[in-house]
Amino acid sequence: VCERHVGRKSTNNLNLTCQWNSCRTTTVKRDHITSHIRVHVPLKPHKCEFCGKSFKRPQDLKKHV
């Protein structure tokens, strides 16, 4: 996730609407949009230590366990 997708508060370029293809999800917090953008990326860095299933976001792993 790069500054171009999320923006920067210090430059008044804070864009809280997802710009990925036709997705237009909007949030009020920067960390929420950063977390949302992860659903568009194929990485799954959060792995269950019990069954080995992997998830894109930590909250998805937490729901699984």
Swiss-Prot record:
Tree of life domain: Eukaryota
Induction per the UniProt record: By alkaline conditions.
GO MF: DNA binding; zinc ion binding
Gene3D superfamilies: Classic Zinc Finger (3.30.160.60)
Gene that encodes it: pac1
Record protein name field: pH-response transcription factor pacC/RIM101
InterPro entries: pacC/RIM101 (IPR050806), Znf_C2H2_sf (IPR036236), Znf_C2H2_type (IPR013087)
Gene Ontology terms describing biological process: positive regulation of transcription by RNA polymerase II
Localisation: Nucleus
Keyword rRNA-binding included in the entry's annotation: no
Keyword annotations from UniProtKB, A to Z: Activator, DNA-binding, Metal-binding, Nucleus, Repeat, Repressor, Transcription, Transcription regulation, Zinc, Zinc-finger
Zinc finger (C2H2-type): 16-40, 46-65
A cellular-component GO term for this protein: nucleus
Keyword Transcription regulation: yes
